[in-house]
Amino acid sequence: MTLLERTNRTVALTEAGSVLLREGRAALDAIAAADRRTRRAAQAEPGLVLVSKAGATSELLLKLLDAYAAEPGAVTVEVLLCGPGEQERLLRDGRADVALLHRPFDSVAGFDTEELHTEGQVIVLPSGHPLTAEPHLRMADVTALPGLPLPRWPGLDGTYADGPGPEVRDHAQLLQLITLGRASAVLPESVRTHLHEGLTTVPLLDAPLVTTVIAWPPHSRSRPLAALVRVATGLHTHHEPVHPNAEPSPST
């Protein structure tokens, strides 16, 4: 089997070599993740590490932690807050035992999951903007607002896609830019509980629904983790979606 193709000037992987490299990296990552989780399990006082995006699902997270702490035999849950899109990596590499992820933005491939909460999205605007007087908007109304571009978040490799919007790394930075009239943002409707004076939200009729899920490695046999997932599923809530073609009622 040939893994490399060599010439006088170049060395390139064959298809077999590319597969071996990809699978080898995955195997090494899995070993490293297993080592981290094994070391945590061997500690004198067992515990769980739960990772969540900073500024997201805070109310749900608080309810989950309080409900689990009241369970007989509950262990300590360390909360690891991270930037957007980082939860998946921290769960895969073993630095976390369980994660709160958000479909369709986070990949849940390879994880066991349970749905916890489904909600619509809103546009966050600086207070006083003309569109804040509208009862509802559509994505076409907000994707190219003059002077209020949507933000650009970093990819998993830390780089930003080209575009007119400001580069942001966290919600605090984003909300300040919106307050200053430099950006707008489409976010889950639960963001309303975190907004300060100077910001207003308007529901979006046709924005994709966001589903918060609790995710964990499929091979886990941890009883504390199973108990945490059981408690989490008991908190499941669902907001009925607004039909994309629905028009706002006079009472809204």
Question: What name fits each language-model region?
Answer:
Residues 1-13:
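A short LG(V/I)-centered, amphipathic sequence patch enriched
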Residues 14-17, 90-92, 142, 176-181, ...:
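Hydrophobic residues within well-ordered alpha-helices
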Residues 16-23, 60, 64, 138, ...:
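Short amphipathic alpha-helical coupling segments at ligand-binding clamshell hinges
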Residues 29, 33-37, 42-90:
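N-terminal winged-helix
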Residues 63-67, 84-121, 198-202:
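Short beta-strand-centered segments that line the small-molecule binding cleft or hinge
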Residues 69, 80, 85-96, 171-182:
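Short helices/loops that flank or line small-molecule/ion binding pockets
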Residues 106, 110-182, 191-209, 238-252:
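C-terminal regulatory
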